[in-house]
Amino acid sequence: RNVTPDSTKEYETLGIKEGMQKWPDLPRVAYVHMLQSQGLLHDTYVYGVDAKKSLTTIINPTETMDGAIISGNCVSACDKNTTYHHQNNPVVADLFEQHGKTINYVCNIITNENVYLADKMRSSDWTAKLCRLLDLDGVIVSQEGFGNPDTDLIMNTKKIEAEGIKTVIITDEYAGRDGKSQSLADADPSADAVVTGGNANQVIVLPPMETVYGHLEFVDTIAGGSANNIDAHGNITVEIQAITGATNETGFNYLSAR
């Protein structure tokens, strides 16, 4: 508490009207932050409320830095957001870097990823409705998880694009170990601006460690593992989906491409 930091940075978002008056010529951009809410260890909490029990709503970007969103996830580790990811979201950081320069960063819109189709339809309807009410010019959408939430991602994208709002999505891929399979479980021509966090089915070999905390007998049954994936020397062959944050869909990794 009494230590002086090496550097400080101040972040600020203005009210809707104030922002429009201050930057009338800058495109209005928001971040649609999808939250895992399938249940059974696929959970997220916003100010203590289970995300699956709430409707799509607006949140100030700086609130996420202060711990408003808490993770309750532990399944398929590669593309689940930990609380640390929420607090240090690179999408929020990068949007703030451009705020007042090339864009007017209006707000975050948080929406859930419930299992049932009726819930998906309701949440995506609300997402598109809020984007329209805010008179946005552009939106960045980040997914959390894969498979079932691919439908939420595409429904959000289709409906936001249908409002005439340019949309970019951030996701990851399950394209098979050879990278030749369809990357998402759902697709639509309107989702034509995509940033990928990588292929979760990519296989790596983890060398043996001198000290292991935990239980090795489960490495062949966790998501990303396979039968007999530990050899006689202790090497573990596993898909990167077993590693927390390996294909994080906020871009919190070191993956790059040229």
Where are these regions (language model features)?
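An N-terminal assembly and electron-transfer interface module characteristic of large anaerobic redox
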Residues: 1-258
